[in-house]
């Protein structure tokens, strides 16, 4: 006995739908790494969508799960080069499985564990990185065109330059009142940065490219970490803590400075990517002496950033 295919019947209201699919599909993703015996492991959630024509009542959602599982098997065997490639292959295969769809879209949100070493005591610790991937496949003259993106959000520390300069002026006035020689004052400020209020900064970088290009996730994380006042660690011995605090206050940065530094590092790090590569950069600083957060953002193509930076 054949079962009725209700999804293939005509809907009562005949309009097309932009997105139909499933959200928050939890999967363990293992991506093989060249030269490594163990794969990179991502604890992930997927959102998977197709568009739906006005002639169909519903989409066959079980096909989405079949495609995801098939591609995850490829990833474990090393046939997939990165998490954006996972999304790209899924989006392309969805077009094969949903013959009525012209556009498919896949989102992936993951936790990625990285091993770290503290700067002074060399203590081993781990850090959880939020990583993201996205892909869109579109039928163009019968051939699917795929656009992919990969990104990460990294936490660091920033120190406010404004408050630091206020404290420096105050300290200089006190030293002058104590009749400390000018050369001694200059020597002190060269060695010891002044206090300031701090922020926990969250930097985000996303790189969007065409189908066959893979952007190393580790390079994205490095750009983000190097763009704030200092890196932070889950575990710090006293020597490490002193180092981090000193480093942050010797490198005080506004939220705007962080985004501009990210842009500079993106151009120098990913200079081999095509000019039409889309870059999204943003920084959120959670203020310690205010109740609000500070925020800055830049969206541009790589070519536009190169032109502005004259690189």
Curated annotation (Swiss-Prot):
EC number(s) on file: 3.5.4.39
Cofactor note: Binds 1 Fe(2+) ion per subunit.
Coiled coil: none
Cofactor: Fe(2+)
Recorded metabolic or biological pathway in which this protein acts: Cofactor biosynthesis; 5,6,7,8-tetrahydromethanopterin biosynthesis
Record-level GO BP terms: tetrahydromethanopterin biosynthetic process
Pfam short name (any one): GCHY-1
GO molecular function: GTP cyclohydrolase I activity; GTP cyclohydrolase IV activity; iron ion binding
Catalytic reaction annotation: GTP + H2O = 7,8-dihydroneopterin 2',3'-cyclic phosphate + formate + diphosphate + H(+)
Keywords associated with the record: Hydrolase, Iron, Metal-binding
UniProt similarity note: Belongs to the GTP cyclohydrolase IV family.
Protein's job: Converts GTP to 7,8-dihydro-D-neopterin 2',3'-cyclic phosphate, the first intermediate in the biosynthesis of coenzyme methanopterin.
UniProt name for this protein: GTP cyclohydrolase MptA
Species in which this protein is naturally found: Methanocorpusculum labreanum (strain ATCC 43576 / DSM 4855 / Z)
């Amino acid at each position: 006995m054949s079962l009725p295919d209700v999804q293939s019947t005509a809907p009562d209201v005949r309009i097309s739908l932009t997105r139909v699919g499933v959200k928050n599909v939890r999967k363990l993703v293992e991506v093989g790494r060249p030269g490594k015996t163990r794969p990179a492991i991502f604890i992930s959630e997927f959102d998977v969508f197709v568009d739906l024509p006005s002639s169909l009542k519903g989409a066959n959602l079980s096909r989405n799960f079949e495609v995801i599982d098939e591609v995850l098997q490829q990833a474990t065997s090393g046939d997939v080069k990165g998490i954006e490639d996972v999304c790209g292959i899924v989006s392309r295969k969805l077009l094969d499985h949903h013959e009525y769809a012209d556009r498919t879209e896949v989102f992936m949100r993951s936790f990625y564990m990285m091993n770290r070493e503290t700067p002074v005591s060399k203590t081993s610790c781990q850090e959880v990185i939020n990583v993201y991937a996205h892909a869109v496949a579109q039928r163009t003259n019968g051939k699917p065109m795929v656009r992919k993106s990969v990104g990460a959000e990294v936490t660091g520390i920033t120190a406010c330059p404004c408050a630091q300069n206020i404290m420096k002026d105050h300290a200089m006035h006190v030293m002058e009142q104590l009749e400390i020689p000018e050369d001694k004052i200059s020597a002190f400020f060269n060695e010891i940065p002044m206090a300031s209020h701090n922020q926990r900064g969250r930097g985000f970088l996303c790189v969007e490219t065409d189908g066959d290009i893979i952007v190393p996730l580790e390079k994205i994380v490095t750009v983000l970490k190097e763009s704030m006042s200092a890196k932070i660690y889950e575990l710090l011995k006293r020597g490490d803590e002193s180092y981090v605090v000193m480093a942050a206050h010797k490198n005080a940065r506004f939220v705007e400075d962080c985004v501009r530094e990210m842009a500079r590092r993106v151009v120098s790090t990913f200079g081999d990517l095509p000019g039409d590569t889309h870059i999204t950069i943003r920084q959120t600083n959670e203020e310690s002496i205010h109740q609000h957060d500070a925020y800055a953002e830049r969206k541009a193509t790589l070519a536009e950033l190169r032109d502005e930076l004259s690189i």
